[in-house]
């Protein structure tokens, strides 16, 4: 994957330097590949509530560890064992795992008894699933929190918004992701990620039934990630409010990732007699089909623009960690 040359750590400073910072949590990143490096960049460009104190990987020659070292961050090629042996670990409050589902199980087994919080970007689903735009507050106390897949981060807020004004009988999510933005590990787990996305659309988005499709887009030059969300809704009396709620959640996600946007206006199609749809396992459907077309560009980090699939997860993880810091500060304040 061809990566940009954004400066890691730009805008970061010593604890307390950032005006209005609630706290300054030392965090560690496991995984020095594309995901970990983008996350490090986003934290470095953040408001100071988080500070990357350590990054570990397994390749001593990778770009991520080199960038971390250049930014003054302690590094180790020893993986989770290397992290545990670093003097900085004594002060680490939260660990991001950007490796893969199998490695995450081993990493969590090593860290679970240390008292650190874990944000899982591997979609291993050991902990509860989190889409910050939908269920952030309900999950902040979990010791291990699993960030939903890129397609779920994009689509679940839309489905949840539509669900406010009617029963979503069926939702379908179709994501096209640039071939250049998918590494070997992601390619072999596309089916697993689709299942996790479908589960999130139903459990967090509120759809009765759902389906997820992921298309690898071979276009060159590469295109940004595009996600289309179809919702079949029973009633159609709330078109204006549905559109307003969709626009509001797009604005909310856009605050986390500026590259998240509507590609076209929200589309509404009434389905009735002579114009019904057949849903396998459900039967004929008459009501309203709502279509939302999204484009997700990797803005503001280490990645090329086409890698919105990575950026939306790292941005969600950063926002979740910042909310954990905020919750911790509020809890301490309440005890004073």
Swiss-Prot record:
This is Acetaldehyde dehydrogenase 1. Belongs to the acetaldehyde dehydrogenase family. The keyword Oxidoreductase applies. Gene3D superfamilies: Dihydrodipicolinate Reductase, domain 2, NAD(P)-binding Rossmann-like Domain. One of its GO terms (molecular function) is acetaldehyde dehydrogenase (acetylating) activity. Pfam families: AcetDehyd-dimer (PF09290). Keywords: Aromatic hydrocarbons catabolism, NAD, Oxidoreductase. It comes from the Bacteria. NAD(+) binds at residues 32-35, 309. The active site is at residue 150. It is an enzyme of class 1 (oxidoreductase). Its EC number is 1.2.1.10. It catalyses: acetaldehyde + NAD(+) + CoA = acetyl-CoA + NADH + H(+). It comes from Mycobacterium ulcerans (strain Agy99). The keyword NAD applies. One of its GO terms (biological process) is catabolic process. SUPFAM superfamilies: Glyceraldehyde-3-phosphate dehydrogenase-like, C-terminal domain, NAD(P)-binding Rossmann-fold domains.
